[in-house]
Structure formats: C-alpha cells, structure tokens
Regions:
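Conserved small-domain helix->loop->beta segment predominantly found in fold-type I
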Residues: 68-151, 169-187
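Residue-level detector of conserved catalytic or cofactor/ligand-binding positions
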Residues: 189-200
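Solvent-exposed alpha-helices and their adjacent loops that cap or buttress functional pockets
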Residues: 2, 14-18, 62, 103-105, ...
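Short, glycine-/Ser/Thr-/acidic-enriched flexible segments
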Residues: 13-14, 28-31, 57, 116-118, ...
Length: 200
C-alpha cells in the first residue's frame, strides 16, 4: 500500500487482459459509489462485457499465480538489463538509480534504455525497432526507449529485443558528439495572433 487514494492499473499492459482494459483502484478513504457516479456521467453505462470478462480472467490469474508470474517478469527484465548493458553504448536503467531522495523506487518491469551513447535518439531506435525488426515497444523520446515487460513475454522475446538492439548499434550508430545537447526542442513557430482573435 503506497498510500494513494486512487490508482489506475493498465491491466492490458501488465496483467494480460485485452487492449483498452484497465482497473481503477480506490483506497479506503474514497467513496467508490461516488466515483462510480462520476464515471457514469462521462462514460457509457453500457460497458464492454468482452473487456470486463478479460479483466476478470486476468484478475483471477494474478490472484492465483501473480507472485510467480511477476517473479519471472522481474528475472527476465534483469536479464535484459544485463545483456543490453553488455552491448555497450546503451544504458539500461536499474535499481542502482534509487537514492532515497530524487529516486525513491524503481519498477523493474519497465525496461528503460538510454540510447544517446550510440548516437541515436530514443525515437530513432523506437522507429527502427518497429519498422525494421517488427518489435513494438512502449515509447521513444529524445534520449531513451521504454519497453514494458509483462506476464505475456517469454525469454525468446527478450533475446529478440536484445539482438535487435545490438543490430541497431552495429548498423545505424553515429557519433554521439554530433547530437543536440538539449532535452527540449524550442518551437520554431511564431504565432502572430492568439487563436481566439484569428479570423477564419
């Protein structure tokens, strides 16, 4: 219990339910009937029984085998981190970042990898993995990629990802010194008139 009043859990990412299904968990200090009323005001009252059934099956599976399943997920993620760091040029973030101050804890199921060491932005590696290797990961930004390891993954999937990252480094790496050294890209668009005053 982390003390949150409410938390959303993407069961379709972590628990094996169908895409678009997630759970909203409420703590003991939250009136769940009131939350349900608010949700019914903004969403359909005719929920998808297919999605709800998949959530229930996933919930049952996690209740019966969740600890064992996530132990395997954690082992696969740690294996992936070690293998990716052995490639060189990449850095797979790990529990070594936890310092009790700015980083309190670390979710081992999220495989976050720094890519600028091979001279490529995370979004470039993301695109290469998707387009050239048929591997869809969670996201890529200016410096990192994020892959989500879940109970549906197998060790073969991890090895395929590690092999693809080694291949990307071998075939597409550039000189990291040539990369922009900023976290944010400034907007090049100048808006001459606020939208509310613009005439159509």
């Amino acid at each position: 219990d982390a003390g949150a009043d409410m938390a959303s859990v993407s069961m379709h990412k972590s628990g094996g339910s169908l895409t678009q299904s997630s759970l909203l968990l409420t703590g003991k200090n939250v009136n769940w009937e009131y939350v349900s009323q608010i949700i019914n005001l903004t969403q359909t009252t005719s929920a998808s029984y297919l999605l709800m059934s998949s959530l229930d099956i996933s919930r049952r599976n996690l209740a019966l085998r969740g600890r064992e399943s996530f132990r395997k997920v954690a082992e696969m993620a740690e294996y992936a981190r070690a293998e990716i760091n052995d490639i060189g040029g990449y850095y797979a973030y790990g529990k070594d970042m936890v310092n009790g101050g700015s980083v309190y804890d670390f979710d081992v199921t999220k495989l976050s990898v720094y890519t600028r060491g091979i001279g490529l932005a995370g979004i470039e590696v993301y695109d290469l993995l998707r387009d050239e290797y048929d591997i869809q990961i969670e996201l890529g930004d200016i410096a990192n990629i994020l892959a989500y390891i879940s109970i549906g993954d197998r060790i073969q999937d991890i090895e395929r990802l590690v092999g693809a990252l080694a291949d990307v480094k071998r075939l597409y790496s550039k000189d990291p010194a040539q990369m922009l050294n900023t976290e944010y890209i400034l907007s090049l668009i100048h808006i001459s008139e606020p939208t509310r005053h613009a005439q159509i």
